[in-house]
């Protein structure tokens, strides 16, 4: 029997290990959040509410049914923060780190799984990369907490201020969007700090750094400002990230927040441009945005961050590959390329698959929630985009949704964090993936 179990474990794919790892942590987190000690009232939380919160934390989303500051006790907040940290850094990253510290040998299976988890190009040097990720993550989160501490200690007292600084630093870096400022007004996020420069700047930098990907950090570490030496993926990530911050910020500045004072207008526009790509904090009331503004945020939420990062969504590279592929068709070029490097056809197929999957799930989920809850379709689509993009922004309807809608959001959050292709490959065998080829025949499109 033991030999059979070991054999089954050996034949599990990397994708299955990653998916089951996330599921296991979500279930354990749900059980911990159901304990009476996890709430300020001392009462147990229902399994559905605990499951939703644990999924949102592990999948670094930030959608909540219960306000984090007013409902959960210090123990409950600690569990949520731990789940955020595990989900942000990755289940496999944590597991490899524990194995290294305990002196255990890291086998090829573990190295291959880690490669998939952080989107590394090769298995070689994966343990060294894991150690680099752990050290850099801890360092950045400590620096972020130290920079936030003067503001939060001033507003909430020393010890609570330290806790709030650490919580928000980790939540921002992991692109989670959970906050404790609901102690002022429940579900208000960071709206009370909309003109506070330190909070705005630190949170935005943490979001961007956490969302550009671990391999991009490696390029920064190895090559400093010599951008020409960066791998092509890092160059694409910097280009797309810059555009997705600058262009939406311009729109928000000129069309959505034109009636507020200049400095507040600058901070609010910039923050609302950065946060939709999977962070989940907000410094403005999103219900007051026009439908165009809300649709722009939906698009940003679906795009998400970059591969191998703490962020979710389709990923910046997916968008870049699809746009570049379309441009190559318009220009009648045979291949898609970036910075003098050709993109493999398999990558383009994967990008198209991911895009189609996200759009279909986003639309179907939104339509089901809209019909079930009898709410406007735009409001429901905003919620499903936030879930599948693992963002956490909401128009305020999350706590009032029914069980069916919550289950839909849970599934979307999980899929958005684990990744569509990961889930597909986890359910398919090698034999199915390597099917026989059929005769080719053209079909007219467009």
Language model segments and positions:
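Membrane-proximal intracellular helices of multi-pass ion channels
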Residues: 1-446
């Amino acid at each position: 029997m033991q030999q059979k179990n070991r054999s089954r474990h050996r034949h599990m794919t990397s994708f299955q290990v990653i998916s089951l790892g996330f599921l296991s942590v979500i279930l354990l987190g749900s059980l911990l959040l159901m304990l009476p000690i996890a709430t300020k009232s001392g009462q147990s939380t229902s399994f559905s509410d605990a499951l939703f919160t644990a999924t949102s934390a592990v999948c670094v989303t930030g959608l909540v049914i219960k306000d984090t500051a007013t409902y959960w006790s210090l123990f409950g907040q600690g569990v949520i923060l731990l789940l955020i940290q595990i989900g942000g850094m990755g289940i496999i990253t944590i597991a490899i780190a524990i194995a290294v510290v305990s002196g255990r040998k890291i086998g090829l299976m573990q190295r291959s799984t880690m490669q998939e988890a952080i989107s590394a190009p090769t298995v070689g040097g994966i343990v060294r990369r894991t150690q680099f990720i752990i050290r850099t993550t801890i360092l950045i989160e400590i620096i972020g907490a130290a920079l936030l501490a003067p503001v939060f200690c001033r507003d909430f007292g020393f010890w609570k201020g330290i806790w709030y600084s650490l919580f928000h630093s980790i939540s921002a870096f992991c692109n989670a969007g959970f906050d404790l400022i609901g102690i002022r007004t429940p579900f208000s996020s960071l709206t009370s700090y909309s003109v506070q420069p330190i909070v705005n700047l630190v949170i935005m930098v943490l979001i961007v750094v956490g969302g550009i990907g671990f391999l991009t950090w490696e390029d920064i570490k190895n090559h400093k400002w010599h951008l020409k030496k960066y791998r092509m993926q890092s160059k694409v990530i910097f280009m797309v990230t810059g555009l997705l911050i600058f262009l939406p910020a311009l729109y928000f500045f000129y069309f959505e927040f034109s009636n507020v004072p200049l400095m507040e207008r600058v901070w609010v526009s910039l923050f609302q441009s950065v946060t939709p790509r999977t962070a989940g904090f907000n410094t403005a009331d999103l219900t007051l945005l026009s439908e165009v503004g809300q649709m722009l945020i939906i698009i940003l939420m679906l795009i998400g961050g970059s591969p191998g990062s703490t962020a979710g969504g389709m990923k910046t590279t997916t968008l870049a590959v699809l746009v570049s592929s379309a441009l190559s068709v318009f220009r009648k070029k045979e291949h898609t390329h970036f910075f003098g490097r050709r993109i493999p056809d398999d990558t383009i197929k994967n990008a198209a698959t991911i895009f189609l999957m996200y759009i279909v799930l986003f639309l179907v989920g939104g339509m089901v929630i809209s019909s079930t809850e009898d709410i406007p379709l735009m409001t429901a689509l905003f919620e499903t985009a936030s879930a599948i993009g693992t963002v956490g922004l909401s128009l305020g309807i999350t706590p009032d949704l029914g069980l069916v809608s919550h289950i839909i959001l849970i599934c979307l959050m999980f899929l958005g964090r684990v990744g569509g292709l990961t889930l597909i490959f986890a359910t398919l065998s090698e034999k199915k993936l390597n099917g026989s080829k059929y005769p080719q025949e053209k079909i007219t499109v467009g």
